[in-house]
């Protein structure tokens, strides 16, 4: 039986870090095709195409410099060509681009293709919240799983020990995806609550922006711990309101929940940029250009999408931390007033 073909849709720093793992495992395990395709948004780097650099030097010099990708990972600039014949699609692009990518892929996939989303964000549809895996699943007609956890891309690429969570309703598919992605230093737990796993990955970025504000304002560890805890409570409350399936508090104790929240509030890019925002007064857009090579920050966008949903449902008052992050980022509320917004939190009433 031929091995399952894998395509990685995306090649930013997280996409490239995952390509390193997937390429290595697919090259080693008989039940995967050793050739892994990776869709790369073509860019010009010093007069050379990024795909050409990746395919000759085996390194994504723009988004994951200093890390060699396995030679069996092949960069392809056309997403349809990259995905042709794939049995497993690994989605890892910024969430605002996923609609356009699905439109391009529609009608070009094999009958039994499955997908896994590593994308942290939510989509705000006409009827409220839509998870990214739902958007992909509906548009492409494929079953979707998710992978979320305390996984800062550079540390995963450096093969430092960490854990992650796969949310998958089908145990056999869950095992297949675990085989594809687990390594001695990238340990995976599979749970069936796909919605809860995914919502953790989206919402923690909002909390991390709040944690960054605390750092930028010089508020110290007690305040930051309170922000993280209140953020976790809002994450759980939001999940219970909006997830269609079961939401058990135990899932928040997996890597996708509290672990991802902690690492993002201490080390992630949302925190770093929010700290600079509080310190310098520069706009988020300006800081994205300066600090992230122009890559988009997920936290503020997710806060905006959530705010629109909460307004629609008349629930803004129940989520003061999420609301404060939105107001500071989009309505010009002074960042110095961030903590005041938390002093009458429903948790304290």
UniProtKB/Swiss-Prot annotation:
Q: Kindly state which reaction or reactions the protein catalyses.
A: sn-glycerol 3-phosphate + NAD(+) = dihydroxyacetone phosphate + NADH + H(+)
A Pfam family hit: NAD_Gly3P_dh_N
Enzyme class comes to oxidoreductase
In the record, N6-succinyllysine modifications are located at: 289
Which terms in the Gene Ontology molecular function aspect does this entry carry?
glycerol-3-phosphate dehydrogenase (NAD+) activity; glycerol-3-phosphate dehydrogenase [NAD(P)+] activity; NAD binding; protein homodimerization activity
Q: In terms of domain of life, where is this protein from?
A: Eukaryota
The record's annotation in Gene3D superfamilies points to:
N-(1-d-carboxylethyl)-l-norvaline Dehydrogenase, domain 2, NAD(P)-binding Rossmann-like Domain
The main location is cytoplasm
Keyword set, alphabetical order: Cytoplasm, NAD, Oxidoreductase, Phosphoprotein
EC annotation from Swiss-Prot or TrEMBL: 1.1.1.8
Q: In the UniProt record, does the keyword NAD occur?
A: yes
Gene Ontology biological process: cellular response to cAMP; cellular response to tumor necrosis factor; gluconeogenesis; glyceraldehyde-3-phosphate biosynthetic process; glycerol-3-phosphate catabolic process; glycerol-3-phosphate metabolic process; glycerol-3-phosphate shuttle; positive regulation of glycolytic process
Which of this chain's residues are annotated to bind NAD(+)?
A: 10-15, 153, 269, 296, 298
**Where found, per UniProt?**
Cytoplasm
What is annotated as the active site? 204 (proton acceptor)
PTM sites of type Phosphotyrosine:
326
**GO CC list:** cytosol; mitochondrion
Q: Which residues bind substrate?
A: 120, 269-270
User: What are the Phosphoserine sites (modified residues) in this protein?
Assistant: 154
Sequence similarity: Belongs to the NAD-dependent glycerol-3-phosphate dehydrogenase family.
Q: How does it assemble?
A: Homodimer.
Describe its function.
Has glycerol-3-phosphate dehydrogenase activity.
Its recorded name reads Glycerol-3-phosphate dehydrogenase [NAD(+)], cytoplasmic
Look up and give the organism this protein is from: Mus musculus (Mouse)
What does UniProt list as this organism's lineage?
Eukaryota, Metazoa, Chordata, Craniata, Vertebrata
């Amino acid at each position: 039986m031929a091995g399952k073909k894998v395509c990685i849709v995306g090649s930013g720093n997280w996409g490239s870090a995952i390509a390193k793992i997937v390429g290595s495992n697919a090259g080693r395990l008989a039940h995967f095709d050793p050739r892994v395709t990776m869709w790369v948004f073509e860019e010009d780097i010093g007069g050379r195409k990024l795909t050409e650099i990746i395919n000759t030097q085996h390194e994504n010099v723009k988004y994951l410099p200093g890390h060699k990708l396995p030679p069996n990972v092949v960069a392809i600039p056309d997403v349809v060509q990259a995905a042709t014949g794939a049995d497993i699609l690994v989605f890892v692009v910024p969430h605002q681009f996923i609609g356009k990518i699905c439109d391009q892929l529609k009608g070009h996939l094999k009958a039994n293709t499955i997908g896994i989303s590593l994308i942290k964000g939510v989509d705000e549809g006409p009827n409220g919240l839509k998870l990214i895996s739902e958007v992909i699943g509906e548009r492409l007609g494929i079953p979707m799983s998710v992978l979320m956890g305390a996984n800062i891309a550079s540390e995963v690429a450096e093969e430092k020990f960490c854990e992650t969570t796969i949310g998958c309703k089908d145990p056999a598919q869950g095992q297949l995806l675990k085989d594809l992605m687990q390594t001695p230093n990238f340990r995976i737990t599979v749970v069936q609550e796909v919605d809860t796993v995914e919502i953790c990955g989206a919402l923690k970025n909002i909390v991390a922006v709040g944690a960054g504000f605390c750092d930028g304002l010089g508020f110290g560890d007690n305040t930051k711990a309170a922000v993280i805890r209140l953020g976790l409570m809002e994450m759980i409350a939001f999940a219970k309101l909006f997830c269609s399936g079961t939401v058990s508090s135990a899932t928040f104790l997996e890597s996708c929940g509290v672990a991802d929240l902690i690492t993002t509030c201490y080390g992630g890019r949302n925190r770093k940029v929010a700290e600079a925002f509080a310190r310098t007064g520069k706009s988020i857009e300006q800081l994205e250009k300066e600090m992230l090579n122009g890559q988009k920050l997920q936290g503020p966008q997710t806060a905006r999408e959530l705010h629109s949903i909460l307004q629609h449902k008349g629930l803004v008052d129940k989520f003061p931390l999420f609301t404060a992050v939105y107001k500071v980022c989009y309505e010009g509320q002074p960042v110095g007033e961030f903590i005041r917004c938390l002093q009458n939190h429903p948790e304290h009433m």
